[in-house]
Amino acid sequence: MPFIKSNVHTHTTFCDGQDSMEDMVKAAVSLGFDTLGFSFHSYTPFDPSYCIRDYYEYMREFERLRKEYGQTICLLNGVELDLYGERPSVCDFVIGSVHYLEENGRRYPVDFSARGFKKLVDGMFRGDALAAAERYYAEVRELAEKVKPDVYGHFDLITRFNQGGAFFDEESARYKSAALSAVESLPAGAVIEVNLGRLFKGEGGMCPSDRLTREMLSAGCRFM
């Protein structure tokens, strides 16, 4: 099977990314990529801080770049859709991700900061971080059922601030049971993103973890 150089989890200055769309295209071309997919954050009305800011301008720029660079690289228009986000009417692919936990109609981010995560655990789960992990993977299962994404993003994001077991024991029966339950909820041949964001930020290894990756391989998942 040939190796395809591609990335579809790409944020730009139209949401919470640091580089323009054209800069990302130029970088992908310079690296010999076959495909680059842009995936703006879907709009979440309860927290618009990181979401797409001007969808129509974004689409105009995307179409301009696809016309200009289309003979060199395949450009795709996608969305990173949260469980509570709004799905655009037109897109080439959907990355499904869980960024929030819900309690009594309110949503709390799981990956904003370690301090914020502790506040979530203390406020929502009375200090029981494993309960937070169980809720997270329950929402991953719900994502698989309701959103049915083309790609599953940063599958075990709940562990982002858990280096060295700072909040919970990833070897515990409770954690492994919750995570495995989420893996078992995936459809046959599900595509899982290998996300290196934590590795580059010095916050741990790749996402998903080695253990979950092995479970996913056994379940017939695919990776990108």
Predicted regions and their residues:
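A short helix->loop->beta-strand "cap" motif at the edges of active sites that frequently abuts
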Residues: 33, 73, 189-190, 221
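A structural motif
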Residues: 33, 91, 148-149, 221
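An N-terminally biased module of ancient metal coordination in phosphate/nucleic-acid-related enzymes
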Residues: 1-83, 148, 159-173, 181, ...
